[in-house]
Swiss-Prot record:
Protein's name in the database: Selenide, water dikinase
Site features described as Important for catalytic activity, chain residue numbers: K26
NCBIfam families given in the database record: PRK00943.1 (NF002098), selD (TIGR00476)
Native source species: Shewanella oneidensis (strain ATCC 700550 / JCM 31522 / CIP 106686 / LMG 19005 / NCIMB 14063 / MR-1)
EC numbers on record: 2.7.9.3
Similarity comment: family membership: Belongs to the selenophosphate synthase 1 family. Class I subfamily.
Amino acid sequence: MSNSTLPSTDSIKLTEYSHGAGCGCKISPKVLTTILASQLPVFTDPNLLVGNQSRDDAAVYKLNEEVGIISTTDFFMPIVDDPFTFGRIAATNAISDIYAMGGTPMMAIAILGWPINKLPAEIAQQVVDGGRQACMEAGIMLAGGHSIDAPEPIFGLAVTGQIALTDLKQNDTAKAGDRLYLTKPIGIGILTTAQKQKKLKDEDSHIAVNAMCQLNSIGAQIAKINGVNALTDVTGFGLAGHLLEMCQGAKLTAKLKLDAVPLLPRALDYLAQGCVPGGTHRNYDSYGEHLPELTDHQKAILCDPQTSGGLLVAVSSEAEAELVALLNANQIEPICIGSLEAPTTATNVVLC
């Protein structure tokens, strides 16, 4: 297709050019286990403090006795139609992994796949500018990148960060008695699916976008609280999936207060209209055996894939007040969704 026959920039809806959306594109945990099961001899490096063994949010390399380097990458297909907003969301989501380890970002490089015979280069430029905007908000440079001709639009970042090793937080170091806090509401997958199904009302189009564009920069401050024992962000595997990683890594059971889980406005309305992303079903098929028996409604909430979702924090009861004060001071509603305890059942999550 020549440039003269490409669609006009005003008529383009990016979600129509991809088979999936946002972190809902992630390969399911079960399939990912197969992919990562290497047949090669194990190679270790004592300075690699966090690798993929615990499926944490990023890799951490010990630079010296005090400082570590954090490295992560994240990219996906369009979750919204507007190119600038897509780029901003994708970049915000990628940078989040640095904050989820308790670190601060240093720089980023872009990852771009673009169907050059289907979409004008000017649209890709807007996507990259959205990524630049998110990087600016995080206080870092978009320092370079790599692009390929691809059948569907893809954008994301590889991000480098730093961490004081005393502040390093992981997803598998929670302790019995910890309280669980979530910093963003659930329901992004439901609302973005409503958009893809053309059911989303214009007056609701900002709800998921505003949540996805909110940086998780509070993670760097949360990590400085001594009683915060584990930290992760909630993304494509849904709240249940990332909570399971936290529980299984620390050999604990979560008592989850389902009624306390915050939901985005109108999420339940669109759920009632059947706006359930395919990633929800893939998530449940991958880890449902580790959950208690759930209704379809409960599955749709707990397994809803989030894009640029919030932080899941495990904090000791002694440090809980300090965490609540920090969240309040940063205009984040402190919402306790449950607690962790020594295993008492065959499942890793108990609803209460």
